[in-house]
């Protein structure tokens, strides 16, 4: 198996751990730290889940435009930043606007891309066992996350506090759980670095397509903004073609159904 396939498995394990800890914490954090009622917290979690589903529709076009590796990095950095806001801020509007809903974007950038990565980085013979391992690792990550959630919550108590050394910052029980999820998310970054640029696995072997060289005279920032612009244009072009397909609306209906099923499981 290619190195990139093992990297994908590692990213999946850590990613679902961070995601599951977050999902288990969300409603309790909203109620205990910000005083929301059960219905209000449920409505916000519902909006978060639906927004994640909506962003998922755009991810395929974005990935085609900027590539798997860049999409991985973009999603992880957004998740790290959003979880940092949720862990350290006590300002309600900031936690929601710069934490909760950006996190939906970051999570949406990761999940479908990982599924595509398994296909891209495995041969035809490896694909069946690769997807079996992928979903086994996902369930293992959920299991470990549940134990981590229970351990931290029981250790600190419902309204406990954790004082971080060096910075002398106090975190509530549920912000501590977001902090733990952020640390797990940060651990993904060095793993993603091992994905080689332009790699694709076929039945004939591993092929590496060199990236186009940067234009002469470009500095880092100008190259970055040009990549952003080209990625945005490519994403919009691909998405316009997508919405003209009849199957797109069937997919949309299916994803909305999945979103509401997720809400049911999150409230159980």
What are these regions (language model features)?
Residues 109-123:
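Intracellular juxtamembrane helix-capping segments at the cytosolic ends
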Residues 43-61, 143-145:
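Central cavity-lining transmembrane alpha-helices of secondary-active solute carriers
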Residues 24-41, 267-268:
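Short amphipathic helix-loop junctions that connect adjacent transmembrane helices
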Residues 55-68, 153-154:
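Helix-to-loop junctions at the C-terminal end of transmembrane segments
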Residues 77-92:
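C-terminal ends and interior cores of transmembrane alpha-helices
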Residues 13, 82, 94-110:
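Hydrophobic core of transmembrane alpha-helices in multi-pass small-molecule transporters
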Residues 1-3, 126-128, 150-266:
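Intracellular loop-helix junctions on the cytosolic face of multi-pass helical membrane proteins
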């Amino acid at each position: 198996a290619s190195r990139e396939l093992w990297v994908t498995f590692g990213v999946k394990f850590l990613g679902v751990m961070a995601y599951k800890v977050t999902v288990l914490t969300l409603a309790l954090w909203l109620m205990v730290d910000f005083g929301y009622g059960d219905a209000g917290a449920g409505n916000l979690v519902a909006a978060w889940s639906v927004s994640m589903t909506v962003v998922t529709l755009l991810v395929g076009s974005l990935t085609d435009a900027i590539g798997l590796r860049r999409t991985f990095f973009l999603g992880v950095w957004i998740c790290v930043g959003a979880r940092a806001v949720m862990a350290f801020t006590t300002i309600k509007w900031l936690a929601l606007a710069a934490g909760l809903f950006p996190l939906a974007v970051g999570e949406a950038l990761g999940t479908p891309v990982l599924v595509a990565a398994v296909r891209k980085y495995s041969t035809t013979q490896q694909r069946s066992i690769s997807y079996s391992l992928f979903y086994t690792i996902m369930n293992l990550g959920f299991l470990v996350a549940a134990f981590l959630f229970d351990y931290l919550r029981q250790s600190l108590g419902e309204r406990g506090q954790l004082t971080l050394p060096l910075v002398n910052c106090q975190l509530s029980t549920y912000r501590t759980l977001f902090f733990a999820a952020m640390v797990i998310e940060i651990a993904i970054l060095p793993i993603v670095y091992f994905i080689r640029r332009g790699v694709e696995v076929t039945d004939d072997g591993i092929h590496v397509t060199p990236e186009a060289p940067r234009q002469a005279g470009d500095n880092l920032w100008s190259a970055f903004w040009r990549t952003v612009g080209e990625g945005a244009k490519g994403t919009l072009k691909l998405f316009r073609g997508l919405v003209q397909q009849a199957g797109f609306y069937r997919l949309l209906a299916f994803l909305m159904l999945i979103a509401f099923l997720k809400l049911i499981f999150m409230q159980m």
